[in-house]
Amino acid sequence: MTQHDNDPAWPDHKPTALLVLADGTVLEGFGLGAEGHAVGEVCFNTAMTGYEEILTDPSYAGQLITFTFPHIGNVGTNEEDIETVNMAATPGARGVILRTAITDPSNYRATKHLDAWLKARGIIGLSGIDTRALTALIRSKGMPNAVIAHARNGEFDLHGLKEEAREWPGLEGMDLVPMVTSGQRFTWDETPWLWDKGFGQQDKTEFNVVAIDYGIKRNILRLLAGVGCKVTVVPATTSAEDILAMKPDGVFLSNGPGDPAATGKYAVPVIRDVIKSGTPTFGICLGHQMLGLAVGAKTKKMHQGHHGANHPVKDETTGKVEITSMNHGFAVDEKTLPKGATQTHISLFDGSNCGIQLDGKPVFSVQYHPEASPGPRDSHYLFQRFAELMRQKKSA
C-alpha cells in the first residue's frame, strides 16, 4: 500500500517499518520514533490537533493509533500537554501510524520534535502508508490486531511478526487498568489553563472528592479542581470501605483502557457500594461503562470504536447537541439498561449509548470526554453539574 515511486519526499531505499495485520496483510513504510516492535489493536483517530494529548491518554493502552489527518507533528511537543498522570506507567498508545513524515515543528510552545519525543517514550512509529485505505479497511472489517515494527536496517522476521499478530488475543476480555493506574494515593490541586497565566493553583476548596484512577487524564483532574474539588486520587483496586472512610462529598469514576467487563470484576462491587451509600457519583468513559455494569447493564465491543474530537452527541433530556471528544472501543448496550437507569445521551453517528442517569439518585455518567484535551469544550458544564449534586447533598 505504499506508493512513493518517483516521489522526492520519500527516501529511495527499502522500508524501515512494517504494519503486519493478523490476517497476514503487510503494509510497508518508514520508521520513526523508537525501534522495536509492539502488538496492539489498530484504531483510527480523526482529530486534526492534539496529537500529544491523544498519544499520552492512558485509555489508548494496547492500541496502535492511525491518524487520519496528514500533518502530525507540525507543532512539536511540550511537557504541559501530556495527559498521563502516572509517568511510571505505560505511555498509552503502543504505536502511531502516519501518512507523511514528521515535519519540523513551528510553535512557540514546542520544546521537542515529535520524533525525538516518541523515541524518549518508547513509542514505535510508521509513516508513508495510505492511511485513508487503512481507515477504510477498519470501517469495513473492524479494528484489526496487528504488530508495528521499526528497524533502521530494514531487516524483519516477517514470519514471527505475522505469528505474533495472529496469536495476540485482542482487547476483548483484557484488563489493562493495572498497567496505567497510580500505585498510591495522592492529591491534585492544579486548575485549568488560562491563556495569559498557564495552569493555575487551587486557593480554596468546597468539596472533598475521591477519584478512582482507572487511567485518569490530567485535564479531568484540573476541571474537578476548577469547580472547587479537593481531589484525592486513589488506585483502581481501592476498596469501597477505604473510599467511604475518607468521607467524600463525591466519587469520580475515571476513564481508562481495556474491556470494562474484565476490569469490572473488581471495580463493579466497589461502585455498587458507593452508589448504595448515596454519595454523588460521576463517571467518564470506562467509568461510565462500569457504572452501567454496576446497575445490571451489559457492555459490548464496537465495530470500529469512536476516536476523535468532532463527535456529535444528543442530550435526550434537553434536545441539545454537543460536539464532543471520544475515545472508546466498547460501549454500554442500551438495550440492557435496567429500570431505574435512564439513557440521557446518544451518539448521532450510530445511536450508541453515551450517557446514563440513575433515577432518584445523584449518580450520572457519560461515555465521551467532557474534559476534551484535545477537543471542544461544549461539555464542561458536566463538572458544574457534579458540583451542584454535591452541593445539594451537603445542604440536605
Curated annotation (Swiss-Prot):
Substrates-to-products reaction catalysed: hydrogencarbonate + L-glutamine + 2 ATP + H2O = carbamoyl phosphate + L-glutamate + 2 ADP + phosphate + 2 H(+)
HAMAP family found in the cross-reference section: CPSase_S_chain
Gene that specifies this protein: carA
Superkingdom: Bacteria
BP term (GO), one: 'de novo' UMP biosynthetic process
SUPFAM superfamilies named in the record: Carbamoyl phosphate synthetase, small subunit N-terminal domain (SSF52021), Class I glutamine amidotransferase-like (SSF52317)
Lineage of the species this protein comes from: Bacteria, Pseudomonadati, Pseudomonadota, Alphaproteobacteria, Hyphomicrobiales
Name the UniProt record assigns to this protein: Carbamoyl phosphate synthase small chain
NCBIfam families given in the database record: CPSaseIIsmall, PRK12838.1
Subunit text: Composed of two chains; the small (or glutamine) chain promotes the hydrolysis of glutamine to ammonia, which is used by the large (or ammonia) chain to synthesize carbamoyl phosphate. Tetramer of heterodimers (alpha,beta)4.
Function: Small subunit of the glutamine-dependent carbamoyl phosphate synthetase (CPSase). CPSase catalyzes the formation of carbamoyl phosphate from the ammonia moiety of glutamine, carbonate, and phosphate donated by ATP, constituting the first step of 2 biosynthetic pathways, one leading to arginine and/or urea and the other to pyrimidine nucleotides. The small subunit (glutamine amidotransferase) binds and cleaves glutamine to supply the large subunit with the substrate ammonia.
Keyword match Repressor: no
